Amino acid sequence: RCREIAVCARRADGYGELIDSVFSRYGVPMFRSAMEDILEKPVLALVTSALAAAGSDYPCDELFRYLKTGLTGISDEERDLLENYALTWDLKGSAWTRKKPWDMHPEGYGREFTEADAALVAWLDALRRRVIAPLEALRKNKDKTGRGRALALYQLLDDIDLPTRLAQRADSLDRRGERTAAAQY
């Protein structure tokens, strides 16, 4: 009888989708439960890191936790180049929000600028502005009421087009057969 079956695994990583697929194929009803850290879910990680980054003058760890959710509209390659530049120059606070364009060599002190280096820095500066703009709008929100802060956060999520990104990710996961993961989006 199905009600007398239990499948236990110390680590369900990698087994969950397989178990779902096999049980579904043979028509065996099932319930699967696993402990998960809710703050590691991409949407919550995005929200908490955006609030922390904007509220703490853009520390690199929070800013890049926000970008590493994959929900901000920049590619992994773009994010990695931006992170390398930020770590090379130990960028903090006003370095992210300054009006003056970035002009530090992408490889550090004492290097001669080539045309390629200048183009890369200009591109990184444009990327920085694109990344920071929605966070700055959140940070500069004047309405400190709960409603005002919620609306500012909602605006950030709208500015980065979160609903579309979530739908795309869910569709991608569903096409790969990862229905449980897709349902979380």
Residue ranges and their predicted role:
Residues 1-185:
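Polyanion-engaging groove/track-forming segments
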